[in-house]
């Protein structure tokens, strides 16, 4: 069990995302980069989950019977497609405003998703366990990475998976993901990312090891401005994803 007296919530981060919550489902709004990134991360998640659990990726609902947790779910950009693929989905976010937006959009889409305004630590303390934990674009916004990764890892069932997507702590990432995306191109509101809170792949791997999870895959994700699309890459200097499993 994690210790409830401690939390990884950064109040300023929650306030920041709550202010722009109404724009979660606007593909041309503040979350445009996530809308563009979504197809790449969705394809990766579906591919790896189907391979792990011996599911037919071409089936209409290949994730049927699997329990998913989307940590820091925001407006539900990942929860909804996972639910459409048959997964039982819990979406958790510390921002009650984000959760309200997510609930409204799910209802409009006739999707049954269990959205909760809660913290990762509270879920872990309650003994929640999942086949798949999605930890996507969240770890760079928490106040205590080690505690956060400990709590999230505790919720992965034996034989289960955890996906993490984040931004590397490199000068290249500072130039592209912060200066470029926030100040020059203004794709994201200024202050969305803070360089000192970015996380290196080896730091995540160390956190996995402490939690008895085994790293099984890692890859970079790069943006092609000519095609206006994101693609898998060997270059992990800026955006990257890692996948870990808990041995059965």
From Swiss-Prot:
Reactions accelerated catalytically: a 3-demethylubiquinol + S-adenosyl-L-methionine = a ubiquinol + S-adenosyl-L-homocysteine + H(+); a 3-(all-trans-polyprenyl)benzene-1,2-diol + S-adenosyl-L-methionine = a 2-methoxy-6-(all-trans-polyprenyl)phenol + S-adenosyl-L-homocysteine + H(+)
GO terms of molecular function: 2-polyprenyl-6-hydroxyphenol methylase activity; 3-demethylubiquinol 3-O-methyltransferase activity; polyprenyldihydroxybenzoate methyltransferase activity
Protein's pathway: Cofactor biosynthesis; ubiquinone biosynthesis
Source species, domain of life: Bacteria
InterPro entries in UniProt: SAM-dependent_MTases_sf, UbiG_MeTrfase
Keyword Methyltransferase: yes
Classification lineage: Bacteria, Pseudomonadati, Pseudomonadota, Alphaproteobacteria, Hyphomicrobiales
Name listed for the protein in its UniProt record: Ubiquinone biosynthesis O-methyltransferase
Similarity comment: Belongs to the methyltransferase superfamily. UbiG/COQ3 family.
Species name: Brucella melitensis biotype 2 (strain ATCC 23457)
Annotated function: O-methyltransferase that catalyzes the 2 O-methylation steps in the ubiquinone biosynthetic pathway.
Enzyme Commission (EC) number: 2.1.1.222, 2.1.1.64
Annotated GO biological process: methylation
Binding-site list for S-adenosyl-L-methionine: 41, 72, 93, 136
Annotated keywords: Methyltransferase, S-adenosyl-L-methionine, Transferase, Ubiquinone biosynthesis
Signal peptide: none
């Amino acid at each position: 069990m994690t210790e409830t007296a401690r939390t990884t919530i950064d109040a300023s981060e929650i306030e920041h995302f709550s202010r722009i919550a109404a724009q979660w489902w606007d593909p041309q709004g503040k979350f445009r980069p996530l809308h563009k990134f979504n197809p790449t991360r969705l394809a990766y998640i579906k591919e790896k989950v189907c391979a792990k659990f011996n599911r037919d990726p071409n089936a209409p609902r290949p994730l049927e019977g699997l329990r998913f947790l989307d940590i820091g779910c925001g407006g539900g950009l990942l929860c909804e497609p996972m639910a459409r693929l048959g997964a039982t989905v819990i979406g958790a976010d510390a921002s009650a405003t984000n959760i309200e937006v997510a609930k409204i959009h799910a209802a409009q889409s006739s999707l049954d998703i269990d959205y909760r305004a809660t913290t990762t630590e509270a879920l872990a303390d309650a003994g929640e366990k999942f086949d798949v934990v999605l930890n996507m674009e969240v770890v760079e916004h928490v106040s205590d990475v080690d505690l956060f990764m400990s709590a999230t890892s505790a919720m992965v069932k034996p034989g289960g998976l955890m996906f993490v997507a984040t931004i590397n702590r490199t000068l290249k990432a500072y130039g592209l993901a912060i200066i470029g995306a926030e100040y020059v191109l203004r794709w994201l509101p200024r202050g969305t990312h803070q360089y000192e809170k970015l996380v290196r792949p080896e730091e995540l791997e160390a956190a996995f090891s402490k939690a008895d999870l085994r790293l099984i895959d890692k890859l970079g994700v790069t943006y092609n401005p000519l095609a206006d699309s994101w693609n898998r890459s060997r270059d992990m200097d800026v955006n990257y994803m890692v996948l870990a499993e808990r041995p059965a």
